[in-house]
Amino acid sequence: MENLNLNPVHVYGLTETYGPITKGYFKPFWNDLEVKEKYGRMARQGHGSVASLPVRIVRTKEDDPDEPSGDLIEVKRDGKEIGEIILNGNLCAKEYYKNPEATRKLFLGGALHTGDLAVWHPDGAIQILDRAKDIIISGGENISSLALESLLVTHPDILEAACVAIPDEQWGERPKAFITVKSGKEGQLTGEEVIDWAKNRSGISRFMVPREVEVLDELPKTSTGKLRKNILRDWAKGGKRDV
């Protein structure tokens, strides 16, 4: 994109914030960094809008990261500790229409809970790892489904990947991956081959390797192209496949 004189900017927002509420502000000294480090910083969701209070990341409930905590204890700004993004400011919605219980949960502790898990870097920039409900907790390790999907699509034959948690007696949860293959590769790649590649030739950490991989003709998506992981979670449990 830069070769075409295009300068990508990373923004982040929700329906409840009327659009973008953070922006990745480019720093000139980033041009002096190694390419991987430069683009890694550009990929962060950045800092809060001038129309909002500073974006914060707070600890989630240890036993249930999908359940927001009202204590609002901030995580360390070390780029490692994972927490939930919370927001305050004029861009935030007031309430859910005629839904007081959803409103109460959204604003638990006096801040808007996004349901997005992220880390907080020393310079104040945030970096999203996953949705709270999509994180896979395996043997005490937090596996970002987004990160695992990004690694799986580096396989030369995989077009798309979507990962969900499945129960595991030993580890609590393990990843299951649903994939589609590139044109011309239909019927030539099995789930077992993908698992073998992930274990031995991909560079994927062992604890992240999917326990199961299923090849689909297409992944279920909304009309806007968003993955319907709720359906994939149901399929992983043996639910009806009528979508």
Where are these regions (language model features)?
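Extracytoplasmic/periplasmic beta-strand context in beta-sandwich domains
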Residues: 21, 175, 211-212, 230
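Conserved AMP-binding/adenylate-forming
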Residues: 1-11, 15-125, 132-135, 148, ...
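Acidic/polar alpha-helix N-cap and adjacent early helical turns
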Residues: 236-243
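Generic structural signal for residues in well-ordered beta-strands
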Residues: 8, 55, 161-163, 213-215
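AMP-binding/adenylate-forming catalytic core of the ANL superfamily
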Residues: 89, 94-95, 104-105, 117-206, ...
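Structural motif
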Residues: 4, 51-53, 110, 156-159, ...
